[in-house]
Amino acid sequence: MKHLAIYPGSFDPLTKGHLDILQRSLGLFDKVIIAIAVNSNKSTLFSIEERLGFIREVTKGMKGLEIDTFQGLTVDYCNKVGANSIIRGLRAVTDFDYEYAISLMNKKLAPNVETVFLMSSGEYSFISSTIVKEVARHGRDVSNQVPEIVSKALLKKLSQ
């Protein structure tokens, strides 16, 4: 049986913390789908096309990886593509409380889908897309927290 996992998120923007979780996930599963959530009720800095472009560029050459977008519930997307696992990265205990509650609901909705929690590597444990955007808005360098293509796009977008 193939083990297919999805790694869902808005990835607005993609961070080095996301990439850390992704690379480690690729060692655990036969295939991982980065599933970019499209939520019309959520305001994003980067369009879905921009986020897809960043992820495609940064993950070029990674084996066992697919990139897709989805709307609706994560477990419905899992069932649609035949995934049996959802990957979630955890930075701190506060992340766990929130993610654990969601994983319990997901289990009720789709008993066949497991949530796999991966702790962030220490050097990425403080990084979040929200914090990166806030720091960049104030003109500070975020190149240690995001891939180069994202850092350049942030500078360009926030200087407009």
Curated annotation (Swiss-Prot):
Example of a GO MF term: ATP binding
Which Pfam families does UniProt cross-reference here? CTP_transf_like
Q: In which pathway does it act?
A: Cofactor biosynthesis; coenzyme A biosynthesis; CoA from (R)-pantothenate: step 4/5
- Site positions for Transition state stabilizer: 18
Subunit description: Homohexamer.
- Family assignment? Belongs to the bacterial CoaD family.
Q: What is this protein called?
A: Phosphopantetheine adenylyltransferase
Gene, per the UniProt record:
coaD
